[in-house]
Regions:
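Internal, glycine-rich beta/alpha segment that forms the wall or movable "lid"
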Residues: 36-43, 75-181, 196-210, 215
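Active-site mouth loops of central-metabolism enzymes
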Residues: 1-10, 71-80, 160-170, 228-242
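Hydrophobic faces of well-ordered beta-strands that scaffold small-molecule active sites
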Residues: 1, 28-30, 68-70, 97-101, ...
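Glycine-enriched alpha-helix->loop->beta-strand junction motifs that scaffold or abut catalytic
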Residues: 62-65, 93, 179-185, 255-257
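An alpha-helical appendage that flanks or caps ligand/catalytic pockets
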Residues: 21-22, 26, 118-158, 188-292
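Active-site beta-loop-alpha junctions enriched in small/polar residues
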Residues: 1-4, 33-35, 73-75, 102-106, ...
Length: 292
């Protein structure tokens, strides 16, 4: 989904979303970046990024069937207003939302949010607990290490059901957390996909240890997809169209249940002329469509 850089205009969002739905794609995904610290080497993608949830609300209004996901919003936000936003988005999209959560990794964003990054793991677990309470309990009341809620009603609840929660992260503790607490796991843009099967296995193992059904979990891969005309040494999902199609099949064999192609992480797209970037995206949508 056009979300970063000059190509991320409402017109491009509409063009990509409606074409993806016509071509039989199953999901549209967004991501979050609140700040780009001056001098930070994180790359051009993060320099200019639209809000992920407002973008999804726009997409919900111009599509009918395709699912909507965020990978990820970070748990340095406050869970009560986020729970309300996600519940509303789930309802207005008629149940099409998937909520991916991360812990965050940019110190300046933690500082701006007034959150201590040293305790982000425990905070993230309590964050998930609060979200689910907000979506399910008739009366919400919470006294935790990080959050407090006096007895309150939190209505309306998300309809037709609460959105599934995916957790990100690649460290062992993060993968085990996803298996214990979440409805699945989502990989990051920096993921070394050669090791994704082992990470999926670890999430499943943690789910089993927690008495949960690992077969019910989703494993979502953010595909940093970069089409390049000539074959050669490369990372997964970078290369010719044929190589990328082979990689898609290989990822399914590794246990990936959902793959989305994220062109925002291709420097040839985010730094290109917006019209040229959109043309490239539309060609790729056609070439990699599920029925292609």
């Amino acid at each position: 989904m056009p979300q970063a850089g000059a190509w991320a205009t409402p017109e491009a969002m509409r063009a990509v979303a409606t074409r993806a739905e016509r071509l039989g794609y199953h999901e549209l995904w967004t991501f979050q970046r609140m700040l780009y610290p001056v001098g930070h080497p994180m790359g051009p993608t993060y320099r200019s990024v639209h809000d992920p949830l407002i973008t999804l609300a726009y997409l919900a209004g111009i599509t009918e069937r395709i699912r909507l996901g965020v990978a990820v919003v970070n748990a340095f936000l406050q869970p009560v207003p986020l729970a309300k936003q996600l519940a509303t988005l789930q309802t207005v999209s008629r149940g099409r939302l998937t909520a991916g959560l991360g812990l965050g990794w940019v110190p300046e964003e933690f500082e701006a949010a007034g959150v201590d990054p040293a305790r982000r793991g425990r905070r993230g677990e309590e964050f998930v607990e609060v979200l689910r309470m907000m979506w399910g309990a008739e009366v919400v009341e919470h006294r935790g290490e990080f959050y407090r809620i006096s007895p309150s009603h939190a209505d309306p609840k998300p309809s037709p059901a609460p959105p599934p929660i995916l957790l990100g992260g690649t460290a062992e503790v993060a993968l085990r957390r996803a298996g214990r607490l979440a409805d699945g796991w989502v990989s990051s843009s920096r993921e070394d996909l050669s090791g994704i099967a082992a990470r999926i296995a670890l999430v499943k193992s943690a789910a089993e240890e927690a008495g949960r059904d690992p077969g019910a979990l989703r494993f979502v891969c953010r595909g940093v997809t970069r089409v390049r005309p000539e074959p050669g040494e490369r990372r997964r999902l970078t290369g010719t169209l044929e190589e990328i199609r082979d990689d898609v099949a290989w990822l399914a064999e590794q246990g990936v249940t959902d793959l989305f192609h994220d062109l925002n992480f291709d420097p040839h797209v985010v730094t290109a002329d917006p019209a040229e970037a959109l043309r490239h995206a539309e060609e790729l949508l056609e070439a990699l469509a599920p029925s292609a």
